[in-house]
UniProtKB/Swiss-Prot annotation:
Entry keywords, A to Z: Calcium, Cell projection, Cilium, Cytoplasm, Cytoskeleton, Flagellum, Metal-binding, Phosphoprotein
Gene field: Cabyr
Post-translational modification, as annotated: Phosphorylated on tyrosine residues during in vitro capacitation. Dephosphorylation affects its ability to bind calcium.
Record PANTHER family: CALCIUM-BINDING TYROSINE PHOSPHORYLATION-REGULATED PROTEIN
Species assigned in the record: Mus musculus (Mouse)
GO cellular component, one term: cytosol
Function: May function as a regulator of both motility- and head-associated functions such as capacitation and the acrosome reaction. May bind calcium in vitro.
Expression tissues: Expressed in spermatozoa.
InterPro entries documented for this protein: CABYR (IPR038848), cAMP_dep_PK_reg_su_I/II_a/b (IPR003117), DD_CABYR_SP17 (IPR047579)
Protein name: Calcium-binding tyrosine phosphorylation-regulated protein
One Pfam family from the record: RIIa
SUPFAM superfamilies named in the record: Dimerization-anchoring domain of cAMP-dependent PK regulatory subunit
GO biological process: calcium-mediated signaling; sperm capacitation
Subunit text: Interacts with FSCB.
Chain positions covered by the region annotation Disordered: 86-165, 246-278, 406-453
Length: 453
């Protein structure tokens, strides 16, 4: 039976032609196969015109030997050159022979070695080599006139001083830096700036003939006596101006070795007047009612006056002198004695014509607990501590102001004032004021003492 499908006949030489183009593509391995096939057939047509008598098989064979082999060799050579090209150094671009006038400036024409003169903080080998030239240029006007040079640096930048072999210290102050660069000040002088002024403080002597100062000291001390807790806080602001005349004309006056910054020495007065002013206040409470009484006095020594200043060198002592027993129905009237000692003494020239006066105002706060005194254990008094103290329930205060006037013992008025002083009984816990001082008058806000609960 005959099939209806048509039979396809492969023309002669098609298989050979397709095999030849496939081999050429495999050998050369082109990037664009379509373009390579078009070139292949064009070259094959040209080659066939010269060899028309050859069979298609022989024609493809000779064409491959003459053309395709060369194409394959050329491709391999090109690939090797592409691999070797990155290894070759890039060509050096030629330098421009001329510059445009718009960008050509005088700074571009300055020689390279001249820039090394601007380095002032660190030495360099070039600076050591040219140190002789710079030194000659620096001392040229004194020795002999120097001839002008074409490559001389402009006058705005002076030549630096000779650089040493080691590193030079550069001061922070611009004035000292300029002086060091000009050679007027040696480099070792700038080492003084390295001293830390924040940690170095001058020591003030204890004995000062003329001084003006203001200080504020807070002292607190816990006291427990016969079942009653007493907390004393002394806040004093003292200001004094002491002017003392010379002891003898032959002896030179002494001055403070460390004066305050920006303060001039006050002139010495001829009159040996001594005036001391101290301010202090005393306040105390017990069950929200002020009950304390205090005496502040200044101890006088012949030829010396003890100034009652309160600072780090002085001690303020508060002692409980007298107190009613816990079971007593009488009102509790504790009495406090404040004795202020000082390490600062001022020698005073004795002169009957001049009087020495002292004004004292004291401020203190005595805090007592509001709890009942019954059943409270008796604890010995603890020493004065300026940092820690016991807290109590009430913190109301009583302010007292006292004024004390001290008259020279040589003055007859002193005897009269001492005679008018009230005598003290043997049981009085307060001793009489030394040196014939009168007892200061106390002015409490409330005189009635509270009774025990």
């Amino acid at each position: 039976m005959i099939s209806s499908k048509p039979r396809l006949v492969v023309p002669y030489g098609l298989k050979t032609l397709l095999e030849g183009v496939s081999r050429a593509i495999l050998k050369t391995n082109p990037t664009n196969i379509t373009q390579f096939a078009a070139v292949y057939f064009k070259e094959l047509i040209v080659f066939r015109e010269g060899n028309s008598s050859l069979d298609i098989k022989d024609l493809i064979k000779q064409f491959h030997q003459m053309k395709v082999e060369k194409w394959a060799e050329g491709v391999t050579v090109e690939k090797k050159e592409c691999i070797k090209e990155p290894i070759k150094p890039p060509p050096v671009p030629c330098k421009p022979t001329h510059m445009e006038k718009s960008t050509d400036t005088e700074e571009d024409n300055v020689a390279g070695p001249l820039f090394s003169n601007k380095t002032t903080q660190f030495p360099s080998v070039h600076a050591e080599v040219q140190s002789e030239e710079t030194s000659e240029g620096a001392r040229g006007p004194s020795d002999k006139p120097t001839t002008p040079k074409t490559d001389y640096t402009p006058p705005s930048s002076p030549p630096p001083a000779p650089v040493s072999a080691e590193y030079a210290y550069v001061p922070a102050d611009p004035a000292q830096f300029a002086a060091q660069m000009l050679g007027n000040v040696p480099s070792t002088y700038s080492e003084v700036l390295m001293v830390d002024v924040a940690t170095s403080t001058p020591a003030v002597p204890q004995d000062v003939l003329s001084a003006e100062f203001a200080e504020e000291v807070v002292l607190s001390a816990p006291l427990v006596c016969s079942g009653e807790t007493v907390e004393v806080q002394v806040v004093s602001k003292t200001s004094a101006q002491v002017v003392v005349g010379p002891v003898s004309e032959a002896e030179p006056p002494k001055a403070s070795s460390a004066p305050l910054q920006g303060e001039q020495e006050p002139p010495a007065h001829e009159a040996p007047d001594t005036q001391v002013t101290s301010a202090s206040r005393i306040s105390s409470i017990y069950n929200d009612v002020p009950v304390n009484e205090g005496v502040v006095y200044v101890e006088e020594i012949p030829g010396y006056i003890v100034i009652p200043f309160t600072d780090h060198d002085q001690v303020a002592c508060v002692k409980e002198i007298e107190q009613s027993p816990p079971g007593s129905p009488k009102a509790v009237e504790p009495k406090t004695k404040i004795s202020i000692e000082s390490l600062k003494t001022v020698q005073v020239e004795e002169n009957s014509q001049h009087k020495s006066s002292v004004h004292v105002e004291a401020e203190a706060t005595v805090l007592l607990s509001n709890t009942a005194l019954d059943g409270q254990p008796e604890v010995p008094a603890e020493p004065l501590d300026a940092e820690g103290f016991f807290k109590v329930a009430s913190e109301n205060s009583l302010h007292l102001e006292t004024e004390i006037v001290i008259i020279n013992p040589d003055d007859p008025g002193q005897e009269e004032s001492g005679g008018n002083a009230a005598p003290h009984s043997s049981g009085d816990p307060f001793p009489p004021a030394p040196g014939g001082l009168t007892e200061p008058e106390m002015q409490p806000d409330g005189e009635a003492a509270p009774e025990q609960v």
